[in-house]
Amino acid sequence: MEEKVLDLLLTALKDRGLVKAGGRQRTDSTRVLAAVRDLNRLELAGETLRATLEALACAAPDWLAGAVSVREWADRYGPRTHSWHPPASTSKREEMALVYGRDGFALLEAVHAPDAPAWLRELPAVQVLRTMWVQNYHRTVTEAGAEVKRRESKDLPPGRLRLASPYDTDARYGLKQGSWWTGYKIHISGSCDDADGLDAATGQATPLGADGPPPRLITSIATTDATVTDAEMTEPVHHMLAARDLLPAEHFLDSGYASAELIVGMKKNFGVTLVTPVLMNSSPQARAGAGFDRTAFTIDWDKRQATCPRGDTSTWWSPATLRGTKAIVIKFDKETCRPCPVRDQCTRSKTGGRTLSLQPRELQEVLDHARLQQDDEQWRARYGTRAGIEGTIHQAVAVTGMRRARYLGLQKTHLEHVFSAVALNLIRLDAWWNGHPLDRTRVSHLARLDLSLAA
């Protein structure tokens, strides 16, 4: 249901020929900060335990009074962690972390004791405490007693599973372009057709009041936790567009959304051409811009053979799996490569022959074609269309405050994003109908919007 309001708007816009399938669209993502504080591991442990005690004090005050030393724990966990400064000494901070750990395990034991009300362990705050302690602490029980230790960084669970806040259990730590944050990511898709393309594809006249190119409207909004990569969302975004019958013929994306597999898969499964740069050849020769990289070799897929720049052929062709993906490994005989006068320009191996690693034929040919296109000035000018999505993201952040979540949890945050997308579409429609420049919209335009569209 959270998508309903955007679905209704886009259906009305499709009926008026303002959005359509088969045109051009562009997509990009940006970070969203959760409505919680950033906490280090010490603060996270203390605040999680404090939040659990607060929940138990409300749900079962009489039981809590008999289970823990209320006065001592109230002094320790009464204030929120951001209201005081932790010790400056590393040893004292480590000792405080162990105190938190021992207290947390003691509270969990009390909650799960046979004489404790069974429903206490079902409280969300208790569930969060249990998960947080499993992720951050070790406990070893011996005849001498229980020993509690904090997990080392290498022993922490992967970021996609690791809780970042006791209050928003969907928020995660994210990293993009060297920037860390706690929260989510949003993927925004929007139309970017020109006027001629729109009229030719829909067969409809330009709506009254329109002037210049058609409005750039948001067609899809996807919200994920901060650890989900752009490439993981390429297919889901196309499924969302297909469900609205708004799949483009060309989809402009940055390299984070693309791979040879995705370029081929989107064309086969959705009929969509991804217009996107791909990662360049990462071989030592290609990075140095000197010597013979893979493109200097001729590949005969039918004969399963490669020919080097000097005309020698490979002696080994074998399917393989490299870093979890299918590949083809090609090798040249070391006796052929060893006396070669240009050996230093071809391989860094001191004794062996040259080795090539290729993707399966269909993927490799798509990758080679995409890399060749990227060097063409005409393709670069065409790809410049993608840059407009940055303006959409800027408007979303400046006008609707999309950079910061207002609510806790992924579902409510996504609902907020859907309503923000609808608001931006209405603002852009009003600006377009009233003859304002496409990318210079103001919130005040919304007040003059003709509400016949919504009706």
Where are these regions (language model features)?
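Anion-binding and metal-coordination hotspots
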Residues: 1-455
